[in-house]
């Protein structure tokens, strides 16, 4: 499995108020994208706000995931950027330390924002993701050229 920018905890401390906010403010303005590549924004689309009810559901999901991390035993690649302004900086380390997988890697990037699959280091993300999956598939899933069969 591969996880990008794992949001076990959000960086914004006000996110903890979402269980209350959902009753008085149905929407919360999203922060401005902080991508390091100005061209990357062309690859993203989203609403300018998000429903606070959905944010509250995310908080509940985060609690459940934190409880279940030790049960995850598949190979795991965790990719996170130190410049991510959405996810708490301790989240990827907590996933790495608490997950039950023995085969796990933490890749920290230093020149991308939250949307690291389209930002400046997207090629590193793609290459490391591909390599991680390929090495775990084994030779029977590879064609004669060393790539995944059928690609």
Identify what each model region corresponds to.
Residues 93, 97-115:
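Catalytic histidine neighborhood in serine/cysteine hydrolases
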């Amino acid at each position: 499995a591969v996880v990008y920018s794992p949001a076990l905890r959000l960086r914004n401390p006000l996110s903890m108020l979402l269980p209350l906010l959902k009753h008085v403010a149905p929407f919360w303005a999203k922060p401005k994208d902080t991508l390091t590549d100005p061209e990357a924004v062309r690859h993203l689309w989203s609403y300018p706000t998000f429903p606070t009810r959905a944010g509250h559901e995310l908080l509940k999901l985060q609690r459940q995931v934190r409880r279940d991390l030790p049960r995850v035993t598949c190979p795991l690649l965790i990719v996170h950027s130190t410049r991510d302004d959405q996810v708490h900086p301790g989240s990827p380390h907590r996933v790495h330390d608490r997950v039950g997988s023995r085969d796990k890697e933490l890749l920290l990037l230093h020149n991308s924002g939250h949307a690291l699959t389209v930002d400046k280091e997207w090629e590193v993300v793609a290459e490391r993701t591909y390599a991680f999956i390929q090495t775990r598939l084994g030779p029977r899933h590879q064609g004669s050229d060393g790539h995944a069969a059928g690609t």
